[in-house]
C-alpha cells in the first residue's frame, strides 16, 4: 500500500515496523461539546484506512484518545456548574453515538487523559532529568524546544505566521516552548497531585504519554506505524508530540504521518471556536448517518471538503443506485465476490485511499450489473455474485448494509408511513374495482408527497423520491 506522508511531503510505500501488524493512533476529540462534521470527516477517513488495511490482510491495532481535561472543559464547568466527570462522560457518550450512526468502528484502545496521569507525570520527569524541560517561577513546566535538534522537521512550519499561533509567555525560554504541566490556578481550576505540585497536564503531553503507555513498541526506531489526525493538528500539536517522544524515549513517535483535509462552510474551516459548526447530531436529524458517511467519504481524505446540500444530495443519488441494484436481487443468497472486482477496489484504495477510482469502479459494476439483469433476468448465479459484491462493498466502505427497501423509507415519520400505506391500500382496492381514474389520482397524490410507487408481483412498493 502507498500512503502520502504529510511530514515527508511524498508518497511512501507502507512497510510495517513488525510483520504485517500496523499500529495506528488517531487524535480524538476534546470532549467539551458535541462533535461537528470536521470530527466526522477525520473519523471516517481513518476508519476507511483501517478497513482497507484489514482487507489487505494486515492486522491493525487502532487507538483513539479522549482529551477529558482542557481549558475549554474547565470553562464549560464554570459556565454550567457541572463537574468534570459530568461534562466529559456526557460528551464522550454522545460522540460514540455519533460515530456509531456514521458507521465508524470503535477503536481497539480508547484511553482518557485523566486515567493516564501516571504516564504523563513519568514522561515529564524524564524530560526534566534530561534537561529538556524546565520549571518557571510560577510552577509551570515547559518543554525546551532548543534541546530538540529536529524540532520543526515534522511540520516544517516554524515560520513567523505559524509561530504567531503560539501563546506568548515572558517566562518561556523560547517562543515555541510549550506547557507540559500547568500549575493550579486556584478556585475554578481542575488540579491533580504531582511531584511538581498541584496542577494538570498540557494538551501535547497527553497523546505522547498515552501512546508510550498503551500502543508503542519500545524496541524499534519508531514507536508506532501511523499517527493520523486533522491537518490543523500538524503544527503545533503533532510537532510537539514528536519532540517530546524523541527526547523522552529516544525514539521517533511515528514512522508515517497522515492528515485529512478540513470541512469548510463557504470556504471557512469548520470549528467550534469559529462558531460555524455543523454538529453531527444536527446533521443526523436531517440526513441518515450512512448518507452523511458516503458524502464525507466521497471526497479524497486529503482534500478540503466544502459542505453544501447540493453536493450531499448528489452523493445520496449515487448511493441510491447501489440500493436500487440491491433491491433487484432482494432475497438472493450471496456466493463469493468477483475476484477482479475485489482486486480493482483494493488496488484503488492501496493508492493513498483513492476514493475517486474506488467509487468509479463501483459505478461501473452497478451499470454492468443492471444491464446484465435487464438482458438476463433469470441468471441466478450472477445475482448471487451481485449480492456478494455488495456485501464486500459494505465491509470495505461501510455503506450499502441496510435493507434495500427500508433505505428508501428513510426520513419518513411513522405517521407519514401510515398515511402512505393507507393510500396504497385504497389504490389497490380501486384497481380491483377497475376504478382506474381513482387509482391514477392516488398515484399522483403520492407523487405530490414525494413518494414513487412500483407495482410488482410482491405487491405495491414505495420509496421516497
Swiss-Prot record:
Cofactor, free-text remark: Binds 1 zinc ion per subunit.
Top-level lineage group: Bacteria
Key words of the record: Aminoacyl-tRNA synthetase, ATP-binding, Cytoplasm, Ligase, Metal-binding, Nucleotide-binding, Protein biosynthesis, Zinc
Protein residues bound to Zn(2+): 27, 207, 237, 241
Gene Ontology biological process terms, A to Z: cysteinyl-tRNA aminoacylation
Zinc recorded as keyword: yes
Disulphide linkage map: none
Motif position, 'KMSKS' region: 269-273
A cellular component term, taken from the record's GO annotations: cytosol
Enzyme Commission number(s) from the entry: 6.1.1.16
Residue window of motif 'HIGH' region: 29-39
Binding site for ATP: 272
Reactions accelerated catalytically: tRNA(Cys) + L-cysteine + ATP = L-cysteinyl-tRNA(Cys) + AMP + diphosphate
Subunit structure comment from the entry: Monomer.
UniProt family annotation: Belongs to the class-I aminoacyl-tRNA synthetase family.
PANTHER family in the cross-refs: CYSTEINE--TRNA LIGASE, CYTOPLASMIC, CYSTEINYL-TRNA SYNTHETASE
Name this protein carries in UniProt: Cysteine--tRNA ligase
Amino acid at each position: 500500500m502507498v500512503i502520502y506522508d504529510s511530514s515527508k511531503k511524498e508518497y511512501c510505500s507502507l512497510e510495517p515496523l513488525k510483520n504485517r501488524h500496523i499500529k495506528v493512533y488517531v487524535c480524538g476529540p476534546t470532549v467539551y461539546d458535541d462533535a461537528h462534521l470536521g470530527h466526522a470527516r477525520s473519523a471516517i477517513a481513518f476508519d476507511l484506512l483501517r478497513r482497507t488495511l484489514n482487507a489487505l490482510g494486515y492486522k491493525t491495532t487502532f487507538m483513539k484518545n479522549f482529551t477529558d481535561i482542557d481549558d475549554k472543559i474547565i470553562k464549560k464547568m464554570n459556565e454550567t456548574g457541572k463537574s468534570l466527570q459530568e461534562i466529559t462522560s456526557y460528551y464522550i457518550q454522545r460522540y460514540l453515538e455519533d460515530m456509531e450512526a456514521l458507521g465508524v468502528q470503535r477503536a481497539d484502545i480508547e484511553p482518557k487523559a485523566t486515567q493516564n496521569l501516571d504516564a504523563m507525570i513519568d514522561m515529564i520527569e524524564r524530560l526534566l532529568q534530561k534537561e529538556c524541560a524546565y520549571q518557571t517561577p510560577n510552577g509551570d513546566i515547559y518543554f525546551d524546544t532548543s534541546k530538540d535538534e529536529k524540532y520543526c522537521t515534522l511540520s516544517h512550519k516554524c515560520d513567523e505566521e505559524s509561530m504567531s499561533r503560539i501563546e506568548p509567555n515572558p517566562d518561556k525560554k523560547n517562543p515555541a516552548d510549550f506547557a507540559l504541566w500547568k500549575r493550579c490556578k486556584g478556585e475554578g481550576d481542575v488540579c491533580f497531585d504531582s511531584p511538581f505540585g498541584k496542577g494538570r497536564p498540557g494538551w501535547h503531553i497527553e497523546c505522547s504519554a498515552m501512546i508510550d503507555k498503551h500502543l508503542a513498541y519500545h524496541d524499534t526506531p519508531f514507536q508506532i506505524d501511523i499517527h493520523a489526525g486533522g491537518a490543523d493538528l500538524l503544527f503545533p500539536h503533532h510537532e510537539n508530540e514528536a519532540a517530546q517522544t524523541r527526547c523522552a524515549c529516544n525514539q521517533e513517535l511515528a514512522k508515517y504521518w497522515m492528515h485529512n483535509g478540513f470541512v469548510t462552510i463557504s470556504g471557512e474551516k469548520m470549528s467550534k471556536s469559529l462558531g460555524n459548526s455543523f454538529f453531527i447530531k444536527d446533521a443526523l436529524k436531517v440526513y441518515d448517518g450512512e448518507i452523511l458517511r458516503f458524502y464525507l467519504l466521497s471526497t479524497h481524505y486529503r482534500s478540503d471538503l466544502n459542505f453544501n446540500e447540493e453536493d450531499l444530495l448528489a452523493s445520496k443519488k449515487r448511493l441510491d443506485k447501489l440500493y436500487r441494484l440491491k433491491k433487484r436481487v432482494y432475497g438472493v443468497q450471496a456466493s463469493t465476490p468477483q475476484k477482479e472486482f475485489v482486486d480493482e477496489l483494493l488496488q484503488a484504495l492501496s493508492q493513498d485511499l483513492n476514493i475517486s477510482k474506488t467509487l468509479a469502479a463501483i459505478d461501473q459494476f452497478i451499470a454492468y450489473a443492471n444491464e446484465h439483469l435487464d438482458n438476463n433476468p433469470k441468471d441466478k448465479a450472477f445475482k448471487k455474485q451481485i449480492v456478494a459484491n455488495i456485501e464486500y462493498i459494505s465491509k470495505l466502505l461501510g455503506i450499502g448494509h441496510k435493507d434495500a427497501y427500508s433505505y428508501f423509507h428513510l426520513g419518513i415519520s411513522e405517521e407519514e408511513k401510515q398515511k402512505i400505506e393507507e393510500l396504497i391500500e385504497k389504490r389497490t382496492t380501486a384497481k380491483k374495482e377497475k376504478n382506474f381514474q381513482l387509482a391514477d389520482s392516488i398515484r399522483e397524490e403520492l407523487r405530490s408527497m414525494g413518494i414513487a410507487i412500483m407495482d410488482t408481483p410482491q405487491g405495491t412498493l414505495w420509496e421516497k423520491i
